[in-house]
Amino acid sequence: MAQLKVTQTRSTIGGKQNQRETLATLGLGRIGKSTVQEDTPGVRGMIRVVAHLVSVEEVDES
């Protein structure tokens, strides 16, 4: 299964509570922090909620 590298690029100050919780669920919390997530519909949905706060790249599995 493909993997996605999710990097937080913007702050959550002034953001909604559900956006902060979604970032925490993705393992983010500071600008510049990155995590690698499996490419599943659930993760894609979480990324959609915080799309304006993160950048996403596909990661090679090899």
UniProtKB/Swiss-Prot annotation:
Q: Which GO terms describe its biological process?
A: translation
A GO CC term assigned to this protein in UniProt: cytosolic large ribosomal subunit
User: Which GO MF term does the entry hold, naming one?
Assistant: structural constituent of ribosome
Keywords recorded for this protein, A-Z = Ribonucleoprotein, Ribosomal protein
UniProt superkingdom = Bacteria
- Listed HAMAP family: Ribosomal_uL30_B (MF_01371_B)
Family, similarity comment = Belongs to the universal ribosomal protein uL30 family.
Subunit and interaction comment? Part of the 50S ribosomal subunit.
**PANTHER family associated with the record:** LARGE RIBOSOMAL SUBUNIT PROTEIN UL30M, MITOCHONDRIAL RIBOSOMAL PROTEIN L30
Protein name, UniProt field: Large ribosomal subunit protein uL30
